[in-house]
Amino acid sequence: MLTNININKMNQLTSENETAKQIVSQLLENHQTIVSMISHEIRNPLTLVSSALQIIEIQHPEVINFHGWSQAIEDIEFMCNLLNELSDFNNGSTLHHSVFSLEKLLKNIAVSFAMSLDSINSNIEFTSKISLNSDNYTGDKIKLEEVILNLLQNAKDAVSEKTFTDSKGSIFLCAEKISDSIVISCTVNGCGISDDIVNTIFDPFVTYKTNGTGLGLALSKKIIEAHGGTLIVTSSDETGTVFTITLPV
């Protein structure tokens, strides 16, 4: 598995050596093909098994109480999610550009996220401040929405797992245009991350969440970098954790 340090070294090598660049490009292309083939071959029988279990559960509802039944269902769902995320990660650098209002997209996401918190009577305070003063942005709308939703969901999970004594957990989504860049930040109060985790948090298959695949943040970083931007994280016990996206305009 390549870490961010390995990738930086590889990028430096390929920028200095044309032959190395061609070799790495071919290896990456072969890797993507192999991953797609394996995912496809596994997904088909897994889908059949999942469908069969659903039919059994409908025809014989008593199986719900069988020992290990619910765990089997959860394991299959996890594998399906893993294959979907693996496929997304494999195609993370492939963008489908369109011109759209990034400000409107972010505001819609904020409204939907706030409604989702209300629907479960969450004790999480969510606020947003989105002011880009620009209607047109060129990028992959669907993948950028996926990144923001992933950051918000991670923030929600982090706050939900923490016990607050003096105040309730809060999430703040901010977006503004600074110079020639759009800066989007997601701040979670009181949920600090240790240095060890920060250093590996964007590495593929590294996860600190129960039933996590370890691909969400790795994919998010890949998508943002494909847009020519950056995704970084800063954290402390006092101020909490901030994920910051910077996109060129």
Enumerate the language-model features and the residues they cover.
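Short alpha-helical Gxxx[C/S/T] motif in the catalytic ATP-binding
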Residues: 216, 220
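Acidic ATP/Mg2+-coordinating residue in the GHKL
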Residues: 188
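Conserved HAMP-HisKA connector
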Residues: 15-39, 50
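Short conserved segment of the HATPase_c
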Residues: 193-204
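Conserved DHp (HisKA) dimerization/phosphotransfer helix of two-component histidine kinases, i.e.
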Residues: 52, 66-116
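Detector for a conserved hydrophobic position within an alpha-helical segment of the HATPase_c
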Residues: 224-225
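Conserved catalytic submotifs in the C-terminal HATPase_c
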Residues: 109, 123-135
